[in-house]
Regions:
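FAD-binding subdomain of flavoenzyme oxidoreductases
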Residues: 103-258, 464, 480-481, 488
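Activity-critical C-terminal alpha-helical subdomain
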Residues: 182, 436-486
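N-terminal flexible segment immediately upstream of the FAD-binding catalytic core
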Residues: 1-65, 81-112, 141, 264-274, ...
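C-terminal substrate-recognition/cap domain of FAD-linked oxidoreductases
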Residues: 26-37, 222, 231-234, 239-409, ...
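Ferredoxin-type iron-sulfur electron-transfer modules in oxidoreductases and energy-metabolism complexes
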Residues: 404, 476-494, 509-581
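Short acidic/histidine-rich active-site segments
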Residues: 381-384, 424-431, 466-469, 508-511
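Conserved phosphate/anionic-ligand binding catalytic regions in large, soluble enzymes, centered on
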Residues: 82, 87, 151-152, 197-214, ...
Length: 581
């Protein structure tokens, strides 16, 4: 029998509010609207029915127990940066905003261990660990806002995965609340223990479908004291691949090995200017080694450099100090804002391949627009060189043909390139709400059935993050990507917000502890007002006037959205509307 869900009655609403407290429970439509958006460009007006902000595992246990008994869907959410719509709620129900469970509970240097709540931010954890000389190595592109709970749920990696691995390599133990409200303690605080089945690993990468993570024990490592970076440009991607394969054969393990294609280099050059104008166009390989001392890394870097140079790059530059290193790394970090200047919309995909098939796959991805006869669609490619590709599609969401071409391109990518190459449809972003239809291409039917059985064992009523493809094969409506403000007649400037969430470290958001009061939340409200989904009211007026116009969000925004100008203009329009009424 297909799972079914109930609406939240007034009586249930009262009970949920009693659990977390009135001030941490929100059912205003305007607040719920802002939680219908996340880091993905996709949405389908999946507006939740209730937002709850719990403070501990006991509150979460009571919420889940009540929700399970009454068949109310529950979706855990950290910072809402998922690029696969993982924290959106297609069936309504409750969003559990875990961002305020953000305490570091223990730092145990002697045992190389930290214990944290799920809402702790990755970069903030590393800032606190730095004086101890330790760090937590996984570093996703969203590390400035990514929560540890979200990183565990998606098994996040990052640009140092080539050497340091991904999140699962560092999780020692978890505290998890199951859908029925029961609490599990999994794993161990010692490095070796085989006294049970490895149940903990089921929850790492489960995307919040089996339980809600409420505590994480993480292994930490000594912070490297020295590092050295080189940038190499190749005319031919085959030569670049051979350089990487030779590095692997040598036993040298760079802490950073990153690829950028020609389109990204061109975009970054125009975006950053300066010395980048002296770089020839080609395929970029960024390679870095780190270690305990300059002497140690100088020898290893020289060996790495000599291996790469043998494959005849057309250009190379070695960072001689930290300032030069940061400048070269900026070429990698600036890819999204640079690409967003070419087309209004960017969609970053996520897939993995064997590195021995790298150049073959890159060439096929570059051919996608031609293969599907797309006139305006562009594709750029970035890659963590352990084999984790991020093809990025550039298009205009207000052009219906562009949208159709984009959707065809995604389909072609997975069906005609990644799966035939023996790859995986996701390496670190997750299946989310948008890749379920591709699961059967990668996994045999008995494996998918086993995933379904595991899901139903832990969550028989299917209340926890429904819509995620793992264990839930129900098809969702095709997500809608028309969600931003472009060329509006009411005078609001063009907006290129990617919903990435990098702006959520905002003073008013920190004060109100609610997504709605973040710059992204305000832009979502503006979106609703412009498209007629929302009507101006006192709450929306208050949200816009709590913005201090400090400009912090502008410094954080990869797309360069001029939030100050937009919010000032929005206030003017609000004032005019208030005067008329």
């Amino acid at each position: 029998m297909e799972p079914y869900y109930n609406k939240i009655s007034k009586a249930l609403l009262k009970k949920f509010k009693e659990i977390v407290g009135e001030q941490f429970s929100f059912n205003d439509y305007e607040v719920r609207w802002t939680y219908a958006f996340g880091g993905s460009i996709f949405n389908k007006n999946w507006v939740p029915d209730l937002i709850l902000i719990p403070k501990d595992a006991q509150q979460i246990s009571k919420v889940l127990n009540l929700a399970n008994k009454n068949r109310i869907p529950v979706t855990p959410r950290g910072s809402g940066t998922s690029l696969s719509s993982g924290s959106l709620s297609p069936y309504g129900g409750i969003i559990l905003d875990l961002s305020q469970m953000n305490r570091i509970l223990k730092i145990d240097i002697e045992n190389n261990l930290v214990e944290v709540e799920p809402g702790v931010i990755c970069d903030e954890l590393n800032e606190i660990l730095k004086p101890y000389g330790y760090f937590f190595p996984p570093d996703p592109g969203s590390s400035s806002v990514a929560t540890i709970g979200g990183m565990v749920a998606n098994n996040a990696g990052g640009i140092q995965a080539f050497k340091y691995g991904v999140t699962k390599n560092y999780v020692m133990y978890l505290e998890v609340v199951l859908p029925d409200g029961s609490l599990l303690n999994l794993g161990s605080n010692v490095l070796k223990s085989v006294s049970s089945y490895n149940i903990m690993d089921l929850f790492i990468g489960s995307e919040g479908t089996l339980g809600v993570i409420t505590k994480v024990g993480l292994r930490i490592r000594p912070l490297p004291r020295a590092r050295k970076l080189g940038l190499f440009i190749f005319k031919d991607v085959d030569d670049l691949q051979e350089a990487v394969l030779d590095l692997r054969r040598s036993g040298i393990i760079p802490n950073l090995l990153e690829f950028m294609d020609k389109l990204i280099l061109k975009a970054v050059t125009e975006y950053l200017g300066g010395e980048f104008f002296d770089f020839p166009m080609g395929y970029v390989l960024l390679a870095e080694v780190d270690g305990k001392s300059l002497r140690e890394i100088d020898e290893e870097f020289t060996n790495m450099f000599n291996i790469i140079i043998q494959k005849n790059p057309i250009f190379h530059k070695v960072a001689m100090n930290e300032i030069e290193r940061e400048r070269l790394i900026l070429a990698r970090k600036a890819n999204l804002p640079a690409l967003s200047r070419i087309r209004p919309n960017t969609c970053v995909e996520d897939c993995t391949i064997q590195i021995s098939k790298f150049s073959e796959v890159i060439k096929k991805i570059e051919e996608i627009p031609k293969r599907i006869n797309a006139k305006n669609l562009l594709v750029a490619i970035i890659c963590h060189m352990e084999g984790n590709l991020h093809p990025t599609f550039l298009f205009n969401e207000n052009d219906e043909q562009d949208v159709r071409d984009f959707q065809k391109a995604i389909d072609y990518l997975y069906r005609e390139i990644i799966i035939p190459a023996g790859g995986s449809i996701t390496g670190e972003h997750g299946i989310g709400k948008i890749k379920t239809s591709y699961l059967e291409l990668e996994h045999e039917s008995n494996v998918i059935e086993l995933m379904t059985q595991i899901k139903k064992f832990f969550d028989p009523n299917m209340i926890l993050n429904p819509g995620i493809g793992k264990g839930d094969s129900r098809e969702l409506n095709t997500p809608n990507i028309k969600r931003s403000l472009k060329n509006q007649s009411n005078g609001i400037m063009e907006l290129k917000c990617m919903r990435c969430g990098f702006c959520i470290s905002c003073p008013s958001r920190m004060n109100y502890q609610l997504e709605t009061y973040s710059p992204r939340g305000r832009l979502c409200l503006l979106n609703g007002l412009v498209h007629g989904d929302l009507e101006l009211n006192d709450l929306i007026i208050e949200v816009f006037h709590t913005c201090t116009l400090c400009g912090l969000c502008q410094t954080k925004c990869p797309a360069g959205v001029n939030t100050i100008e937009i919010f000032e203009k929005a206030r003017e329009i609000i004032h005019k509307n208030c005067e008329k009424s």
